Design a protein with these regions (language model features):
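Short, glycine-/polar-rich solvent-exposed loops and beta-turns at beta-strand/coil boundaries
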Residues: 1, 5, 55-58, 123-125
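Extracytoplasmic beta-strand/coil segments of soluble accessory domains associated
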Residues: 1-19
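Extracytoplasmic
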Residues: 8-10, 38-40, 58-60, 73-75, ...
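Short acidic/polar hinge/loop motifs at secondary-structure boundaries
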Residues: 18-47, 66-68, 72, 173
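Extracytoplasmic loops and strand-loop junctions of Gram-negative outer membrane beta-barrel proteins
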Residues: 45-46, 75-79, 113-117, 177-186
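Flexible, surface-exposed loop regions and adjacent strand-edge segments
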Residues: 124-129, 161-171
């Protein structure tokens, strides 16, 4: 989706109020938060030129994800999912403590997504996501929070082709990036991506 057909680089994305768009491409790398479904639920959206409390909104709008441990829903949550697209199975465990009597809050998330073969032939998916956050709040309005997360991923790609090729092989899911080498399946375009991140946030409610 492109708001007003503008490039995604005009959509400003923040985490705890800090800008997170890539400095080279200008776009936000959503693979940075892949698998963190419960964490990315805490988000504020702002339309272009709409007043908000975290940015001078971008031409294609702005999003601000709240990764503070105290903002996560309390309790334990276990999720098991099956799909027939990028991955086949997903397991997720999420924990949030909420603030205790001493003003501490903790949150964690572990997610694993796997596919031996995705929707398209020759594709596989192997991704592990983690999140850990801690926050301390004082009665004088000050709060300190630390969060770290990552999403190491190994996935095989799908290549584009032409109608003529699809007709010749009689398969509209034909993937030119894969084949057999020495009797084993091999994809020539395997993406390995891991960009660990951490953020330290000081809040002072005056």
């Amino acid at each position: 989706f492109r708001y007003r057909a503008l490039s995604p680089k005009y959509n400003d994305v923040y985490i705890n109020g800090a800008p997170m768009n890539d400095m080279e491409s200008g776009q936000f790398r959503y693979s940075l938060v892949g698998g963190l479904n419960q964490q990315t639920r805490n988000v504020d959206f702002a339309l272009p030129f709409e007043n908000n409390n975290f940015s001078l909104t971008g031409m294609a709008g702005s999003n601000n994800y709240d990764f503070r441990a105290g903002s996560m829903a309390g309790g334990n949550r276990i999720t098991l999912s099956g799909a027939n697209r990028n991955y086949t199975l997903r397991g997720m465990y999420t924990y949030g403590s909420g603030f205790n009597s001493k003003g501490w809050a903790f949150a964690t998330n572990i997610t694993y997504r796997w596919a031996n073969r995705g929707y398209v032939e020759g594709t596989f998916y192997n991704a592990f996501s983690y999140f850990f956050g801690v926050q301390k709040k004082w009665n004088n309005g000050h709060s300190l929070s630390f969060s770290t997360w990552g999403n190491p991923t190994e996935r095989a790609s799908q290549g584009a082709s032409t109608d003529e090729v699809y007709w010749l092989v009689n398969d509209y899911q034909y993937n030119p990036y894969w084949g057999y080498q020495n009797g084993h399946r091999r994809n020539s375009r395997v993406v390995n991506d891991f960009a660990p991140a951490a953020i330290f946030t000081w809040d002072w409610n005056i």
